[in-house]
Swiss-Prot record:
Pfam families recorded: Ribosomal_S11
Name listed for the protein in its UniProt record: Small ribosomal subunit protein uS11
A GO CC annotation given for this chain: ribosome
UniProt keyword list: Ribonucleoprotein, Ribosomal protein, RNA-binding, rRNA-binding
Species the sequence originates in: Beutenbergia cavernae (strain ATCC BAA-8 / DSM 12333 / CCUG 43141 / JCM 11478 / NBRC 16432 / NCIMB 13614 / HKI 0122)
Glycosyltransferase as UniProt keyword: no
């Protein structure tokens, strides 16, 4: 009986990440009431780097804090700078508390912010919103 190969059963094959040389791109900040997700793409929309509050190490209600959004934006910006990113246009979506903090931390890590756009979707009387909380 021939020996089993490792890749067939348990271990995963990991593909080497190639360094993309992109100097200008887009930063998408999705800030919800529960989490903040930062994705940095090239101008065509291919994701170069991303980070979220949960991926940075926060759990539960701490993911929705501005500090968690700051660390997520810094992590995504550092990964994008490894690929040569220098300038980004920022698109912010959602009502969360980490919107402004994430933009500021993108600037603080050395990325030049060209423009800031709010692309939060507005309902044209679509689905019924969730009921009001009674605390």
């Amino acid at each position: 009986m021939p020996p089993k190969s490792r890749t067939a059963g348990g271990a995963r094959k990991t593909r080497r990440k190639e360094k993309k040389n992109v100097s200008h791109g887009h930063a998408y900040i999705k800030s919800t009431f529960n989490n903040t997700i930062v994705s940095i793409t090239d101008p065509s929309g291919a994701v170069i780097a991303w980070a979220s509050s949960g991926q940075v190490g926060f759990k539960g209600s701490r993911k929705s804090t501005p500090f968690a959004a700051q660390l997520a934006a810094e992590a995504a910006a550092r990964r994008a700078q490894e690929h040569g990113m220098k300038k980004v246009d920022v698109f912010v979506k959602g009502p969360g508390s980490g919107r402004e903090t994430a933009i500021r931390s993108l600037q603080a890590t050395g990325l030049e912010v060209g423009s800031i756009s709010d692309v939060t979707p507005q309902a044209h009387n679509g689905v019924r919103p969730p009921k009001r909380r009674r605390v």
